Amino acid sequence: IKIDNQKVDCLFLLIFLMVLGHTFEQFRSESTVISILFSCIYVFHMEAFVFLAGYHSKDTTKCRETAVERFFLPYVLFNFLTYLWIALINGTKLSVTGFQLFSPHSTMWFLFALFVWKMMLKDFARIRLILPLSILLGLGTGMFSSLGIHDSLTRIVSFLPFFMGGYLFQPEML
């Protein structure tokens, strides 16, 4: 098995910063330093994850073929388990209408977004000016408090420029 050490190092750093950021979130009101560190991490960490996801999505056919198995099914499973967990903690009765497939709980939005981006990438890649167009769409979402689906659609559109930027990025560009 060939391991790309730079990829592993970059992902490890981002995951470490994400965990650190979530830890800092609990204490940011108690310390100015922690609040500043929290803000520094949150300025770029999701954008970097999305950019890397786009960068590692060069094979558009494979992306579409594996999107359901790699992203949608885990999303459904973990979103449902999160729904069960929240219902258990809150003592809420389970109901068919309580679980909403397209309303991701917490961080599940990222799996849902990856599924959408991977499914749409082959079509997006055919659009000549997709990067500037995605930037305009991303900025446009800022004009609305929500596009629906509990902010999932807003996040999908607003992070699309980073995904497409990663997809279009070539190492020779550095």
At which residue positions do the language-model features occur?
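Membrane-interface helix-boundary signature
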Residues: 3-7, 11, 35-38, 65, ...
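Functionally critical transmembrane alpha-helices in membrane proteins and complexes, commonly lining
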Residues: 5-59, 71-80
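Membrane-interface starts of transmembrane alpha-helices
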Residues: 6-13, 126-137, 150
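Interfacial loop-to-helix transition and helix-capping segments at the boundaries
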Residues: 34-46, 97-112, 145-162
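Hydrophobic cores of alpha-helical transmembrane segments in multi-pass inner/ER membrane proteins
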Residues: 46-56, 109-121, 159-167
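Structural signal for the C-terminal ends of transmembrane alpha-helices
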Residues: 54-62, 119-127, 143-144, 165-174
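Membrane-interface alpha-helices at helix entry/exit sites of multi-pass transporters
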Residues: 63-71
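Membrane-interface helix-loop-helix regions
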Residues: 70-123, 131-147
